[in-house]
Amino acid sequence: MAEAGVGSAEGAEEERRAVEENFPVDGNSCIASGVPSLMNPITKPATTSFNNSVVEIPRKRKGSDSDNQDTVEVDGDPQKRNEDEEHLKIKDFREAHSQTEKRRRDKMNNLIEELSAMIPQCNPMARKLDKLTVLRMAVQHLKSLKGSTSSYTEVRYKPSFLKDDELRQLILRAADGFLFVVGCNRGKILFVSESVCKILNYDQTSLIGQSLFDYLHPKDVAKVKEQLSSSDVSPREKLVDGKTGLQVHTDFQAGPARLNSGARRSFFCRIKCSRTTVKEEKECLPNPKKKDHRKYCTIHCTGYMKNWPPSEVGVEEENDVEKNSSNFNCLVAIGRLHPYIVPQKSGEIKVKATEFVTRFAMDGKFVYVDQRATAILGYLPQELLGTSCYEYCHQDDHNHLAEKHKEVLQNKEKVFTNSYKFRAKDGSFITLKSQWFSFMNPWTKELEYIVSNNTVVLGHNESAEEQVSYGSQPAEGAVKQSLVSVPGMSSGTVLGAGSIGTEIANEILELQRLHSSPPGELSPSHLLRKSPSPALTVNCSNVPNKELIQLCPSEAEVLETSEQNQGAIPFPSNEPLLGGNSQLDFAICENDDTAMTALMNYLEADGGLGDPAELSDIQWAL
């Protein structure tokens, strides 16, 4: 039995050695790390006892159990090893990810610290700012620079066919101002364009080399200095610390070295004017006692900052000031005169003037009516087309409008009328002011139409009684006459007033014919009359200098009819409306039938309705 026990002990010892050789126990072993509890019964007696017999006795007693455990452990080893390997891979991946995140955080912190050192607003801070505050300050600093590269390079683009002087003249003409260059250190005027004479009435040579601060209003000097010296003139945002929640106060002032080329500038200032300009301002300003307004003009300056080498600008004498910066900083801007706005009276509401546009032919007949006229006058555009504007104007305004009508036909400039009354559709009168100018066809060199920009001065504010009283008061020098009351017409208008414009147009055409060279070269407008032919020559007293006017046959027939009836020679069918004794006196008629007959005879003579030759030209519908 003793030998058998010894033999079994030796067999167990050999099996243990074989297991140790196949699966060494060390720090990197999978079994040692994965199943330490299974190895403890084998390794623990060896480490705690130095006697071989003591080690062999417990193994002898538990020989069968340990054999079974070792057999099971060896049989399930591949699956266990796979789980251990996966566990190690996950552990290694987590360790590598944590190391990567740590390196990224360290790198970001270093970049934030470098950014904080580069931002001027962060330097005066005694404590360390959080990351969010540093980023906000960086954004604010970048906004203050206002794009020094891209916006500045855009200024250099110009068409290749334009020279620098031509481009400068075009810019000054479009801006309606003067160009000037001012140094940022002392405010010295380095350049000013010749157009400054038109605005400030100063000579160009008298301003170059002078200090801009000497011409500024005392209260505007500090503002202009701020624009010339500070690189951050825009209102800053309120910065709040993310950790403490308190507002961060920054006391930072930009030095000359921080002025950035291309930074935009726009400000208003008051500049001293010359004496001749002061005299003009005394008349337009409501309070001439204020000396500041009389001496200074408000100028709107817009431009950008520019860096130049001192040698290019010619400021060698200022090199002592430019020690801290390699380039010379200056402001390039355009100054435009800001118009003076008269203060509005208290209680008044400033409303945009009501306007509408119309077009007339040479004889004053509407050829185009703006749609806005419907809301003002009540007429539809098609109701006014083809009718004369004199038919709707008050009779007391005919003389004034006729003078302006002649003026706009003879001149190419704009003509402004005084206030006149225009009859609306409901019978009331609206006060208008008009601006007339003639449009010439660029191909035929003939007048196409007259454009009229009409502005409402007073709305529908006159009743019928006021209109009658207004019409009953004639102009100065006019003879009081009895007016005809025709049903459907306002009391202020005159029957047959539409021929006034035709008379004026014919008069202007005849004057042009007389003052022109050979008659064959004359090309009168075909809108009013046919080509002239020798017919009848009359002496018209209303034509300047008693010129002789050549009339067409249709006009001659009207004159012959008027000679037989009245024994006088008036202007053909139109003159009675302008002269002082030209009103149709229907009061001599005994009854309404006689007045109506006379009215129809006049309309036939005026419109040519009784001429059978003209009826043949009408295209009758079949």
Swiss-Prot record:
Alphabetically ordered keywords of this record: Activator, Biological rhythms, DNA-binding, Nucleus, Repeat, Transcription, Transcription regulation
Domain PAC stretches: 417-460
Biased composition (Low complexity): 1-10
Segments of this protein annotated with the region Disordered: 1-29, 41-86
Biological processes, Gene Ontology terms: positive regulation of circadian rhythm; positive regulation of DNA-templated transcription; regulation of transcription by RNA polymerase II; rhythmic process
Cellular localization per UniProt: Nucleus
Domain bHLH: 92-145
Induction description: Expression in the pineal gland exhibits circadian rhythm. Maximum levels expressed at CT14, and between ZT14 and ZT18.
GO MF entry, a single one: E-box binding
Main location per the UniProt record: nucleus
Quaternary structure and partners: Component of the circadian core oscillator, which includes the CRY proteins, CLOCK, or NPAS2, BMAL1 or BMAL2, CSNK1D and/or CSNK1E, TIMELESS and the PER proteins. Interacts directly with CLOCK to form the BMAL2-CLOCK transactivator. Can form heterodimers or homodimers which interact directly with CLOCK to form the transcription activator.
NCBIfam families (UniProt xref): sensory_box (TIGR00229)
Name of the protein in question: Basic helix-loop-helix ARNT-like protein 2
